[in-house]
Amino acid sequence: WALLKNDFPQLKLHMIGKLQTNKVKFALPLFDYIHSLDSIKLAEKISVEQEKKNFKPKIFIQINLGKESQKSGIDEDNLANFYQKCVNEYKLNIIGTMCLPPFDEDPSPFFKKMQNLSEILKLKEISMGMSNDYLDALKFKATFIRVGSKIFGNRS
């Protein structure tokens, strides 16, 4: 991807999924967007690397609205403080929020909560919704959706 990125600068690459702190130095030169900021430790690492690389990716804070133990993300009760710390102390370019609602529940209440949280923080971008629920996500102002299965089919 690094070679292609240089040849096609108009392409913007998005990092989705868990970003490990030890991979940040490799991810920063490659990805224009990071959809999964989920901890202070990761925020610190991105801050250090963006200074070294002189590049600030556009970042979404991942929120664990379903309070699921198997998923990463900031608890909504800590979101405002986390956001302020990321912007003011770590100088991160936070542009939005991201969530993955519980798979076995109606996603609409979670999408509505994301819309409200984003409005409170005055963030314009919301990354939520996948092939099975993107239409619901769009009703609640999602600006980035993931529809790989709709385009390419289910994984085998």
Name the predicted role of every residue range.
Residues 135, 145:
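Glycine-centered loop/turn positions within well-structured domains
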Residues 141, 148:
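Active-site-proximal glycine-rich helix-loop-beta segment
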